[in-house]
Amino acid sequence: MIYHEIYDVIVVGGGHAGTEAALAPARMGLKTLLLTHNVDTLGQMSCNPAIGGIGKGHLVKEIDAMGGLMAIAIDQAGIQFRTLNSSKGPAVRATRAQADRVLYRQAVRTALENQPNLDIFQQEVVDILVENNRAVGAVTKMGLTFKARSVVLTAGTFLAGKIHIGLDNYAGGRAGDPSATMLADRLRDLNLRVDRLKTGTPPRLDARTINFDVLAKQHGDAELPVMSFMGAVDLHPRQIPCYITHTNEQTHDLIRNSLDRSPMYTGVIEGSGPRYCPSIEDKVMRFSDRNSHQIYLEPEGLSTIEVYPNGISTSLPFDVQMGIVNSMKGLEKTRIIKPGYAIEYDYFDPRDLKPTLETKAIEGLFFAGQINGTTGYEEAAAQGLLAGINAALQVQGKEAWFPTRDLAYTGVLVDDLCTLGTKEPYRVFTSRAEYRLLLREDNADIRLTPIAHELGLIDDARWARFNQKMENIERERERLKQIWIHPQSEHLAVVNELVNSPLTREASGEDLLRRPEVTYDKLTQVAAFAPALDDKQAAEQVEISIKYQGYIEHQQNEIERHKRHENTLIPAEFDYDKVESLSNEVRAKLMQHRPVSIGQASRISGITPAAISILLVNLKKQGMLKRGEL
């Protein structure tokens, strides 16, 4: 049976990638359908109850700057907010929020149900409809076919998912949910490279059986941050602390003595796990010189007794999990509510994707989230947003859009995936970005909101707020330029208390703010420079843009030099076989990856600077040398 209505975009999956992928085209005015196996798990936090962190918080800010949902949802659901690396430079400062799972899921579902142009339908998808090498719809388990002009697949860990607890295993997409076996089988028939990855989750603990009195307490920041540029502190629910315990030698001995019952160490699990979120088995074996690992006990919400022990992800048998938990301080009598487990699932080689996240093999079919080899809610959501945007643009007959590495962490993420691929679950770090001083959390809206406005992704209120902020920044910078303090000034004594070395010549407000020891807050407490802006976001931007102006300009100059070749396009029809001076190995890699630009080609493993020079010469010789906006 074919559904009577034809959609512009169909999104398969209602996780963090799927929700952003569905909201984007709907906001752009396209008729969108979100297909999910269970509407009650829309926006479900399957693993850790937190959003943000190093690199991840940057992604959340970028999603928000483009009108996405994640930051707004966590502002309504965050029960502990912290700014990480607050004592370091602005490039690596990151916001992290502990979440109430129920409140977060409610915020996501409310947003989806109130979004114009978006329909939601509960049914498992078993097939992607492909005609003339183009995705044109999705088929559900009940035999109902939905037709569309583009399809975004965000299946998470559900494709041929297999859950492991000890040496026992069974099919499942996550605990309590079935595996998408039929869809996985169908996708394996397509012209796409597929492999297996693994991830895991710790057991959930009963808070009533934890002795919190003997544990170190960790509070959130006294001055609460917000995640969304449109957010406000009064949107946050009640704030509560987390607690800290540690593994010990008893814990480690138990783990070492149980490896013969571990699915990872007996070869039952073949997929690679996340390097930067290893299981407790891996931590004990890889860091054998350490006799203790820190474990964070994170409440799962305000209305639940469940506690997430961050740091003991495991697939060991249940009796071993009980022993691990009870071996730690404060957890001697703790009960487990849900066992930890590992899950193995299909993912597709992201090198088979265009930077728009459209598959190279099938037109109109976009992939986003964990099926591209990533790990993390934030990475999934960023991909979902990008895939949804490009699915919509394709339907509208408009030029595709994706961010470059110097524009957004989303650009770094996608370029890494599409160019290098991954053999283990990929996560974002600030260290992956060459231009991280320009890709800060605080300026994500300055980088991306004007683009979002052009694409039709943001509403009038956000656009007005953005323009007001930009006016405030410009006006305040100009004001500080115009105010001067000289050696005879009546305010000199107060100013000299702020600076490490007394003023010997006149200085403007901008000059003073460039000094490392002078902050905007301190400067504007001096009568000559008062009053301070009441717009905190604009005030922060004024201080950073002045204090780091020289570094920012240097990095921008670097980008301009790099862009001379970064954006030199390689036409899809370019024939590498005709470039005889390339080695067979280089030629094979270029033909395999089909990079869209010289910049992308230069990041492929094994492609030398000499090979890039040869490519440029041949592009020029064939009259194909042209630069474009990527």
Swiss-Prot record:
Flavoprotein is among the record's keywords: yes
Domain of life: Bacteria
Protein keywords: Cytoplasm, FAD, Flavoprotein, NAD, tRNA processing
Chain positions recorded as NAD(+) binding sites: 273-287
Assigned protein family: Belongs to the MnmG family.
Quaternary state and interactors: Homodimer. Heterotetramer of two MnmE and two MnmG subunits.
Protein name in UniProt: tRNA uridine 5-carboxymethylaminomethyl modification enzyme MnmG
Gene that specifies this protein: mnmG
